[in-house]
Structures are given as structure tokens and as C-alpha cells.
Amino acid sequence: MPLVLENAELIAFIPVSNLQAARRFYESTLGLRVTDENLFAVVVDANGTMLRLTEVTDLTPQPFTIAGWQVPDIDATIDALVARA
């Protein structure tokens, strides 16, 4: 018997303090496509995984990464991101 969520699509929730600034960063700097938007969240497609950027009123930064990408050349990727920022 398959697991309940075995074939379900994952959507990750990322808290942000400024929804429009986050949208600009994920769309313009990271190059992700916006798939949905409302007053409370913006959803971007990260190569098939949906990231829901959700505005929260009391954002407490954490000392760990909440999302990461595996890339073939980290130095080239950093250079490309810096050039877009």
C-alpha cells in the first residue's frame, strides 16, 4: 500500500518580513518563476518544488539554512548571483 504522501507534491513554506522584496529577490535574483500570488504569499517554482513565501509579522532569523540548491559549480553560481544582485 503506498504511503499517504508518497505521490503528493511538496510545497515548502518560507517566512519573509517583506513579501514584495522577497518576490523581487526570488524572481529577479534567483530567476524563479512566480506561479501564484495573493495578499499573504507568493509561490515560486524551484525546479518542480513549490516555495511559498509567506509574510509574517514577527520574523525571527534562525542560525541555519532553510533552503538550498545543489549546483554543479558553486563558484560560477555565486558569481552569476552577485552579478544579478
Which stretches of residues belong to each language-model region?
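Vicinal oxygen chelate
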Residues: 19-20, 67-85
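Amphipathic alpha-helical segments
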Residues: 20-33
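Proteins with a high burden of low-complexity, intrinsically disordered sequence enriched in S/T/G/P/A and R
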Residues: 2-4, 56, 83-85
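Terminal low-complexity, poorly structured segments
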Residues: 1, 26-28, 77
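N-terminal beta-strand motif that seeds the catalytic metal site of vicinal oxygen chelate
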Residues: 1-21, 50, 64-67
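Conserved short beta-strand elements that form part of the metal-binding/catalytic scaffold
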Residues: 32-72
